[in-house]
């Protein structure tokens, strides 16, 4: 089996050498042809010796070679399982499989040895997507989107053994009605969030990792008119709005990793960051841009975009709802957009209209369930007398932590009314949650 893998990999590498113009789809098609030829020659040779080989075995062999060329080899079945949420690999022998229902199982070895495991990751990084990525001694970390849509992060050299984590976004095609069905929002929130998008207001979706920020952004994006010209910008393509068939004019933009020596600007040769791409995106005559996740320096052009565009959205990792504005200010000052807290606050109030906070309660370790829901929707009203942002929680947490209407909006009231939003929805002060939050320990997080 390993000989077949290596033969197909060598032929594929020779085919791609010096040619960077093929799309991932073209590379996959070429790889399938090469794999089929290699497997067919192997089966024919065995049959010529008189060995009986079933057709089903030939297909299984082909699937295994393709998993080696374009997938994660022995890990591929786990990453393809729709019930699996995370796969964690620590060295070739230790595999942890985390299921959406909270189960944790030990998987079979990921490879024969660490070297083979690294080869698998390096191969899929180089052939699996349009913007080639690498995992090397000089570039010991890797972040990428796998062909099946899962997200992969990997490290080596700086860790005792290669580390790989894959994460599945189990809900790709989703709208706000689906979010009501998932009990992540209630009908009141559903109508309000739709109005926010239709009113072209700028939004940050914040929350801890795994709280459903990206899924909610996908759902809110379905309220963007189908024919609107807009962009998504990500370090690794993850939102997938260009793949749903629901948008005629969405442009997915992905950052490009650099390789080799550092240039005069201190960046690896060939690197194109989101920070660099933002100014050019602003010149494409778009109304809005959606950024999958703001982590670092891209916070600066993101707020520049929000200052000049309408209806933009991004996600941000924050542990607590009351820490969102401070986290934004911290990033703006760290990356040079402001030299004081007051300067950061001015940037925030000029650019941002709403903060939506997504929370998570995970009681699986004590025999319960995992719950993801919106807990806050906060309007950024303006700058207060103390040179701090004035905000008001249009929705705030009820006794169980889930969002309930609190007050009517101030700054954005007219814009929301122009979308047809009925303010009477906000008089449902108990909310309209379709199911109780079935927690073992009462109260919010």
Located regions from the model:
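Residues at the beta-strand->loop junction immediately N-terminal to the Walker
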Residues: 206
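The conserved Walker
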Residues: 209
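N-terminal accessory targeting/assembly segments
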Residues: 1-135
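Phosphate-binding/switch region of NTP-binding enzymes
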Residues: 345-385
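Conserved lysine of the Walker
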Residues: 213
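Switch/coupling sub-region of P-loop NTPases
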Residues: 203, 219-349, 359
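NTP-binding/hydrolysis catalytic cores, primarily Walker-type P-loop NTPases
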Residues: 368-445
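P-loop NTP-binding catalytic core
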Residues: 90, 98-199, 244
